[in-house]
């Protein structure tokens, strides 16, 4: 499987690892990367499998949360990246935080924006929930059935987003970015460009549906790594995110990390990286 990634800035610079979410790709970081490289950082920004310029599996059954974790971890190991500052967004958090849990010695600090690592918590009942909830979730989506584009943009964003993406014949990647990110028509076409037709969009189609698929593994990442984390960890969410709905449970999960600090970015919506290009180190200092 071929993974496309950007490698910008001085090769001896401090490493910034930027990981996109759904349905974006590394093009999301086009405004942030020049700011970072101008300050001497080396920026690595991959496209996950099924997105951007990376290889794309045509069957939704070939995609899993663990597959994405494995591919991103393999990339970091092959590039032998160390002392990394990771900035993860949306699904980049669910994947990236699991990668960090598998290779914690390679990371020095983390910024998580409009994302979380969803887990049930400790205790017997919560352990039971981690096994049952994925099935309840799938049953709920099946019972509710497909959502139209109009339903998706009309409200109840998270549930309707999953129903739309899971059942859409041809998910409108550029349209999603334009709706949630207020991008121009030219930028809309740029986001859509890596996908000549619906066959190439299986990764984007199934990604939201996979969100609760590995709650148990997420929980073990907290217990084994993140509850013992002693390095800087910043939660940098926006105050106007229609996708997550600024769900306090998402922040509560990350607050299990002892060093976690939280700031709120005023104004931008879900794709906050389209509007701001701060230095991760500056964010950490704040």
Could you tell me what each predicted segment is?
Residues 275-280:
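Conserved small/polar residues in nucleotide/adenosyl-binding loops
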